[in-house]
A protein has these predicted regions:
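Short, acidic loop-to-helix structural element flanking the phosphoryl-transfer center
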Residues: 1-24, 30-34, 62
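Glycine-rich phosphate-binding loop signature in dinucleotide/nucleotide-binding domains
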Residues: 18-20, 72-78, 134
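Short secondary-structure boundary segments
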Residues: 27, 53, 85, 102-106, ...
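Conserved H-loop
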Residues: 42-47, 75, 121
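Conserved Lys-Pro-Asp/Glu-containing loop-to-beta segment of HAD-superfamily phosphomonoesterases
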Residues: 58-90
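Acidic, Mg2+-coordinating phosphoryl-transfer loop and its flanking beta/alpha structural elements
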Residues: 81-119
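Membrane-proximal basic amphipathic "stem/tether" segments
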Residues: 150-174
């Protein structure tokens, strides 16, 4: 059973309308990711899907983030990684990318704040300015605005297993 968390579709739709290119990075095999995203009707939002078998390295190694940033031709200073696990935060830090961590999702029962991400949020809709009320949107410290208006949001492995590392509830069954 897969359930998309509240606000996920709205957030992905809004980011897409803003021209934000999004990628999904997961340690799970790539062949399972796209069908699940399509089943949940959110696959179209992701330009790149990087599975655990796409590259030789897996998170927390930053190789997948570097790969996506190279493909998007966007520097780390204009990228944002959304995740819900220690591996996500470590990968983002190693790539020099700011990381927004979701307080719910996959982190082996440990508070994600222990990993010291750039910011911890409880609702993905905080990525949408004004969605949860005036002034509710997030502001990351020292962000370098993109001159072209394009940026990339890299979402992680649970985006198909938890959709955006907390976006969906799904129990892996081998």
């Amino acid at each position: 059973l897969t359930v998309v968390y509240p606000g996920v579709r709205d957030t992905l739709k809004w980011l897409s309308k803003q021209g934000v290119e999004m990628a999904l990075i997961t340690n799970k095999p790539e062949r399972f990711v796209a069908p699940l995203l399509d089943q949940m009707k959110i696959g179209r939002y992701f330009r790149w899907i990087i599975g655990g078998d796409t590259l030789p390295q897996k998170k927390p190694d930053p190789a997948a983030l570097f790969f996506v940033m190279k493909m998007a031709n966007i520097p780390a200073s204009q990228s944002l990684f959304v995740g819900d696990s220690r591996n996500d935060v470590l990968a983002a830090k190693a790539a020099g990318v700011q990381c927004v961590a979701l307080s719910y999702g996959y982190n082996h029962g440990r508070p994600i704040a222990e990993e010291s991400p750039t910011l911890v949020i409880d609702d993905l809709r905080l990525l949408i300015p004004g969605c949860l009320g005036a002034g509710a949107e997030i502001t990351l410290p020292d962000t370098d605005p993109s001159p072209s208006g394009n940026s990339i949001v890299v979402v992680t492995r649970k985006l198909w297993m938890k959709v955006i590392k907390a976006l969906a509830r799904w129990r892996w069954r081998a």
